[in-house]
Regions:
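Short, Lys/Arg-enriched N-terminal segments with co-localized hydrophobic residues
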Residues: 1-9
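Mixed-charge interfacial surface used for oligomerization/domain docking
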Residues: 9-12, 18-27, 31, 35-36, ...
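Class I S-adenosyl-L-methionine
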Residues: 42-111
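Short, surface-exposed connector motifs at secondary-structure boundaries
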Residues: 83-87, 117, 226
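A glycine-rich beta-strand to alpha-helix segment
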Residues: 90, 119-120
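N-terminal low-complexity segments that are often proline-rich with Ser/Thr-Pro
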Residues: 232-235
């Protein structure tokens, strides 16, 4: 009797760290691996359940030092479990060790799971741009495209995404020694907003300064219009 060859139905999964602010993704297997926010007294895990407004208010009034902690290799491996094809998007590697940890976890996962493949993309950004990449990955997977094609097309798409942002406060930067406290205080009193972008190298860099929310939105819009070939995300 002739034997029929049965091909394994490959299970795909998209995974992102919590800097993307994406905690659920419809119609695809998805996981969000949380970063942690650390103060001198407490550790906050950045999950969907965290009270973001309360945390933001605490950060505004907190006088001590704050920092973040990225997911470790074990965290990533737990998220990869059960998938044959894994697609990962991380916060820029210039700000966090999440990308390197995800890469190392991918190598370990492929070695311990025969036939598994892991693709890790450094967003070279954070926040809204990572979300854009994740949503495009989901569309490619739902279209039934093979692993190598998905990887190739998301890299090409990434070349045309761009993050612009405005900072309402410099308080956290001052607490961590990035700017002088006096500069942060003056900026707060004058209502100065810092306009920045994620550079091609993955650094978050300052473009200009403006006053007030209206001025910040106007400047962001002008920058966006000046670069029509990019899919800009304003955060």
């Amino acid at each position: 009797m002739r034997r029929l060859k049965v091909e394994k139905n490959m299970k795909s999964k998209i995974i992102v760290d919590s800097s993307a602010n994406v905690y659920q993704l419809p119609d695809v297997d998805f996981a969000c691996v949380p970063l942690k926010i650390l103060t001198d007294e407490q550790e906050y895990v950045d999950t969907e359940e965290v009270d973001a407004p309360a945390l933001a208010q605490m950060m505004r009034t907190y006088k001590g030092r704050t920092s973040t902690s990225c997911p470790n290799i074990s965290d990533w491996l737990t998220a990869y479990e059960g998938a044959d094809e894994v697609y990962v998007v991380t916060i820029t590697g210039t700000l966090s060790g999440a990308y390197n940890a995800a890469l190392l976890a991918g190598e370990e996962y492929e070695q311990s799971h025969e036939g598994a493949r892991v693709f890790v993309l450094d967003s070279l950004s954070t926040g809204a741009e990572s979300r854009l990449l994740v949503e495009r990955l989901a569309a490619l997977i739902k279209a039934g495209k093979p692993f190598d094609t998905v990887c190739e097309e998301i890299r090409a798409y990434h070349e045309h995404t761009h993050l612009l942002f405005a900072l309402e406060s410099l308080a956290n930067l001052a607490r961590n020694g990035r700017v002088k406290p006096a500069v942060a205080a003056v900026a707060r009193m004058l209502g100065i907003r810092v306009i920045g972008q994620a550079s091609d190298a993955g650094d978050l860099e300052v473009l200009c300064k403006t006053r007030g929310e209206h001025g910040a939105l106007e400047r962001l819009s002008l920058i966006h219009i000046s670069e029509p070939t990019r899919h800009s995300l304003i955060s």
